[in-house]
């Protein structure tokens, strides 16, 4: 029951957070529009993951939408790092054909974990490069690092690799909800200050609405 409620809360928080990048994607006319579009796709894809999780469709959520959202997140990290400094990076796609749903879920969890580790490396690097805790680059990197750690913890807990004997419930999902609340607050506060005092939401990039 707790896990179902956490999926529902996460979906609501994510949809609220998605309003800002969706609005910016529709209004912006410069290259930053690509960045906000990719961020929007990540948010909505992950929201769908929580919706199917809320309805108990574990195989569809963890086997399709979770790794898909992580792949989009990696793409976002590559594009964002390209705005800061051009860098040649590549992500190899692999296709696995299996027939057993349980085996499929296990393999997709393994693939998701690998993708999460790739994303973790990208955003740790971005956070270290930022060196300014007030910058968008640092704040979104911290959100994603916390989110990734929550996802990895959840996968390891479900797989039985780690056990929290003193704690109840899905610890990874609880960390995930906290990170999404932080993410939503960060987006809305930056949007508020952008509208009120004309400050760019993303430092070094023109986010002026036309």
Question: Would you name each region that the model predicts?
Answer:
Residues 1-18, 98-118:
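Hydrophobic transmembrane alpha-helical segments in integral membrane proteins
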Residues 8-21, 34-57, 66, 70, ...:
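Hydrophobic alpha-helical transmembrane segments of multi-pass membrane proteins
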Residues 15-27, 77-82, 116-130, 185-192:
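Alpha-helical transmembrane segments in multipass membrane proteins, preferentially the mid-helix core
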Residues 25-36, 58-59, 87-91, 127-137:
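Membrane-interface helix-boundary motifs at transmembrane edges
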Residues 29, 33, 39, 134-136, ...:
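Sequence/structural signature of long amphipathic alpha-helices
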Residues 44-45, 75-76, 105-121, 141-150:
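Alpha-helical transmembrane segments of multi-pass integral membrane proteins
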Residues 61-86, 122, 146-210:
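C-terminal transmembrane-bundle signature of multipass membrane proteins
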Residues 82-107:
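Surface-exposed beta-loop interaction hotspot
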